[in-house]
Amino acid sequence: MLVPLAKLSCLAYQCFHALKIKKNYLPLCATRWSSTSTVPRITTHYTIYPRDKDKRWEGVNMERFAEEADVVIVGAGPAGLSAAVRLKQLAVAHEKDIRVCLVEKAAQIGAHTLSGACLDPGAFKELFPDWKEKGAPLNTPVTEDRFGILTEKYRIPVPILPGLPMNNHGNYIVRLGHLVSWMGEQAEALGVEVYPGYAAAEVLFHDDGSVKGIATNDVGIQKDGAPKATFERGLELHAKVTIFAEGCHGHLAKQLYKKFDLRANCEPQTYGIGLKELWVIDEKNWKPGRVDHTVGWPLDRHTYGGSFLYHLNEGEPLVALGLVVGLDYQNPYLSPFREFQRWKHHPSIRPTLEGGKRIAYGARALNEGGFQSIPKLTFPGGLLIGCSPGFMNVPKIKGTHTAMKSGILAAESIFNQLTSENLQSKTIGLHVTEYEDNLKNSWVWKELYSVRNIRPSCHGVLGVYGGMIYTGIFYWILRGMEPWTLKHKGSDFERLKPAKDCTPIEYPKPDGQISFDLLSSVALSGTNHEHDQPAHLTLRDDSIPVNRNLSIYDGPEQRFCPAGVYEFVPVEQGDGFRLQINAQNCVHCKTCDIKDPSQNINWVVPEGGGGPAYNGM
């Protein structure tokens, strides 16, 4: 049972809150702690403490304004924008008037988009056959493709044989945020109503249980949960069909999975966290069009992951680099951020960065479950597209092309059903089952099926290297046609071992030239939130972080978060520690919601426009 917020009069605590971005965490060494003090209230969000029982909300006008549309799309990423563009293309071609509204939680289109990104352009060219004439930002065709295995000191080159997923011939290195921004312009030119800075916070339902639309979040709420004088209720958007294109681990999709039991016939999703930086490097080290991928060091063979280093041709010697770490890792002492910083010091990586300048940083979770983890995609009144259900081709390290194609197929399926209905009617919750059928008959389904066994093959005794052997034998020869389907090992949060069973990892200190601390890194993400609002990182039980996560796992949230949101600080009275949530640091990666071993953290949307401000990430 939660208790009232303890009085926090400590001067150090006030200093912490005076900073906009906080330090990563206070080191707890290998000791697990428990607290003798009363558990302070951490969570004040109305999703945990309903406002109808709070006297401070008595007399507040809770009426919401409602708008009607034919289609509402949640999320302006590659999938959502592809659906929006294709719907309006079809409407123009068939001389139909369809109202399409798209809401995006970022302040600008593309500001929350982060990917490698090496783009397979097939679906993009299908959507925009005249992309060159329209000036789409595909500036860097791949000219060189390399793959290697890293040991601590050496790089072992591995040939990329024709037909293997890693082959990038014909692809483009892109800054996906810029591409998404360009797609947003095309959508608006076609008549799509695009609303950046509006965060979809709630799914609305008809009396019959079908999806009615969404509501954006309320704004003007104090940190303690009380209404401000500037309080405004969110907006309701009703539609015949609502498309959920939130990206990986969307918070509304989580609700829909439970409401409609969409995961009844699939395996749990498994995830990775991708950390990325942009650097301007010395021109003599610049190889425009080069794509370089590695596996191995600094991760052990039982920790799935790999790195990328892409040389962009953007008018300056720019490289995009990053590390992906599978979130099914077992050691609670592992820090994906610090593994990334350590990786940059490898003898095959460091020379590229020496003399350069880091200009951007960010992180985002990504789906790795593949074919086995795809849920049911349609339900009365709505459907899922893109990285929300998870169409990433993991060995190919690409999901943008499949996300775009899913958006195109969704739009075509919806248009067919909309135009067979009376567009002037307020049809209740159209169930567009044709979309799932069309997807299963497309190249997306065939592609994901062919690589379905590669990611789970890494769970054997040989780990990642066993997966490489499996890929070389079965994928290269049989092209994924083996008569069996391997399974994943369960949910990622279940894989974490107790701290007593693991060895703490000693990471080298950052040198400030190649590797950096978390504080300076988060600053480069541009992340910003209104400070005086309830933390959007909500806890179902405020006592669990200390009494379970810290006690058993030595507080893994302070290490798996790539933005320093979670830290354990000394209590003001008594012995031990308490969890402090620095919500303004959050880059919306969703890792905490995925990896928390107690599944106590629930990520909800903050006020619209908050979060990272990525520029072409």
Curated annotation (Swiss-Prot):
Location(s) in or outside the cell: Mitochondrion inner membrane
Is this entry keyworded Cytoplasm?
no
- Sites where the protein binds FAD: 71-85
- Report one GO cellular component: mitochondrion
What's the record's note on cofactor binding? Binds 1 [4Fe-4S] cluster.
UniProt keyword NADP, yes or no: no
Reactions performed catalytically: a ubiquinone + reduced [electron-transfer flavoprotein] = a ubiquinol + oxidized [electron-transfer flavoprotein] + H(+)
Q: Look up the EC number in the record and give it.
A: 1.5.5.1
Q: Where in the sequence is N6-acetyllysine found?
A: K96, K132, K223, K357
Gene3D superfamilies given in the database record: 3.30.70.20, 3.30.9.90, FAD/NAD(P)-binding domain
Record-annotated 4Fe-4S ferredoxin-type domain positions = 577-606
Family classification? Belongs to the ETF-QO/FixC family.
Q: What is this protein called?
A: Electron transfer flavoprotein-ubiquinone oxidoreductase, mitochondrial
